[in-house]
């Protein structure tokens, strides 16, 4: 039986979008009907998302969600009240009205058709989690992804995630992108009163191997080539310029290493232990953009690193930089399972990454060196690796990684029983879902 998968993803150009595209590419269209819900007005207003949209595989069917959902006044009141006070409502009548609104929207989009699986791939907006969960109330298996350490995301950036957490009990699977991340989120969200129990699953990100390897063969940007010509060692990092990506600490680490270099150039040394830490003529290329770009530029100037740290901006093809650098550094304060780390290991680039659950697992599967997140810790890890490069290099079997990740993904979004019965022609009718609205109070 060819199974129908219904996804929603925002297609913001980041690691989540890269992993999503790789997953779609890996799904065999002879086995799966792959469908993606989009909002046309959102795409029209965001050219960067349009670029991701154009990269969708040809076998993906696009379903538009036009206009606004029809609603009754008391239903809309419940939806608005939940947005303001997600932990306050536990009555059956409240949740009956809430779900009536979203179930009607599922029928507006797909009519009476019910997909085998409905997946909210982003996992950050309660509106989309609610819509996906509403298909579950009609018979779909439903999933919501976790791409990061959600307690950190909630405390540091997105207080509205409390609404998403409250809705976890209304999907069948909460899918973290690594086993370690699943353990972290299960434990930390329990401290917030969110019980995930057996609902918490994991499935690692996939990688578009061909795109990475072919992309790395293209010419590198002139600014990166100039940086390599002027420095003995060139580092790179990739990611949006935001607090949790911790690029500021990496920039300060480069300053520390170059300060040592300057001290050495003026001092011939006397062979004592204090002179043993030889300085490095080191440069850094940062790929990405974001709200902290101005702050990072100012920090580069204040540290006297103009000409040594180059901001390359958002790149459609960052792989010549990633493959051409001596070392990829991922200094994040919290992460899920970063696609950039997979890409670096696929290209054979040496890796230093902060000691976080997702990073730790990937380095165990492949190679690399873990570090702390302070400028001093990062500088020490960089110096160790550049003086002994083999410590951060190794072999990563990306084909095996992708095969295992796809199996885990299908197991999570379809359910192990459905996956193991893939070859059967006749399936029992979709199971009826009992209302779980009353359970909201148990996890609030």
Model-derived regions: residue spans:
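A charged, aromatic-enriched C-terminal amphipathic alpha-helix characteristic of glycosyltransferases
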Residues: 15, 389-420, 424-435
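A conserved mid-protein helix/loop that constitutes part of the nucleotide-sugar donor-binding site
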Residues: 15-22, 233-261, 291-297
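An aromatic- and histidine-rich active-site surface loop
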Residues: 95-104, 118-138
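A short, active-site helix/loop in glycosyltransferases that binds the activated sugar's phosphate group
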Residues: 128-129, 170-198, 207
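Short beta-strand->alpha-helix junction loop in the catalytic core
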Residues: 150, 180-181, 197-218, 291
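Aromatic "clamp/platform" in nucleotide-sugar-dependent glycosyltransferases that forms part
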Residues: 314, 333
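Short hydrophobic beta-strand element within catalytic cores of glycosyltransferases
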Residues: 350-353
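Conserved acidic donor-binding segment of nucleotide-sugar-dependent glycosyltransferases
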Residues: 365-376, 383-388
């Amino acid at each position: 039986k060819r199974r129908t998968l219904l996804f929603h993803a925002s297609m913001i150009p980041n690691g989540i979008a890269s992993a999503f595209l790789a997953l779609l590419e890996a799904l065999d269209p002879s086995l799966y009907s792959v469908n993606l819900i989009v909002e046309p007005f959102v795409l029209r207003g965001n050219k960067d998302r349009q670029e991701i949209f154009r990269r969708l595989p040809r076998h993906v069917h696009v379903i538009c969600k036009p206009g606004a959902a029809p609603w009754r006044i008391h239903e809309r009141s419940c939806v608005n009240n939940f947005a303001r006070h997600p932990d306050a409502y536990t009555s059956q009548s409240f949740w009956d009205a809430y779900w009536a609104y979203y179930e009607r929207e599922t029928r507006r989009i797909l009519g009476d058709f019910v997909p085998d699986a409905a997946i909210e791939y982003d996992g950050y907006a309660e509106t989309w989690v609610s819509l996906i969960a509403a298909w579950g109330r009609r018979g779909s298996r439903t999933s919501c992804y976790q791409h990061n350490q959600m307690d950190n995301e909630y405390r540091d950036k997105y207080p509205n995630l409390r609404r998403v957490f409250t809705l976890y009990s209304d999907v069948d699977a909460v899918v973290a992108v690594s086993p370690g991340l699943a353990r972290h989120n299960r434990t930390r969200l329990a401290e917030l009163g969110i019980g995930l129990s057996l609902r918490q699953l994991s499935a690692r990100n996939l990688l578009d191997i061909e795109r990475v390897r072919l992309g790395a063969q293209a010419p590198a940007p002139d600014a990166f080539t100039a940086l390599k010509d002027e420095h003995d060692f060139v580092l790179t990092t990739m990611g949006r310029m935001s607090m949790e990506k911790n690029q500021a600490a990496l920039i300060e680490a480069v300053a520390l290493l170059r300060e040592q270099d300057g001290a050495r150039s003026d001092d011939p040394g006397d062979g004592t232990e204090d002179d043993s830490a030889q300085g490095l003529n080191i440069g850094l290329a940062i790929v990405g953009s974001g709200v902290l770009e101005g702050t990072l530029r100012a920090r580069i100037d204040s540290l006297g690193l103009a000409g040594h740290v180059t901001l390359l901006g958002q790149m459609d093809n960052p792989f010549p930089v990633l493959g051409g650098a001596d070392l990829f550094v991922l200094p994040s304060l919290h992460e899920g399972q970063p696609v950039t780390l997979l890409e670096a290991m696929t290209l054979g680039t040496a890796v230093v990454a902060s000691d976080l659950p997702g990073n730790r697992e990937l380095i165990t599967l492949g190679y690399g060196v873990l570090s702390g997140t302070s400028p001093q810790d990062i500088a020490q890890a960089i110096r160790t690796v550049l003086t002994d490069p083999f410590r951060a290099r190794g072999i990563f079997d990306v084909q095996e990684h992708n095969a295992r990740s796809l199996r885990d993904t299908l197991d999570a979004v379809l359910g192990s029983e459905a996956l193991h019965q893939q070859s059967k022609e006749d399936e029992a009718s979709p199971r009826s879902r009992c209302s779980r609205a009353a359970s909201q109070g148990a996890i609030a």
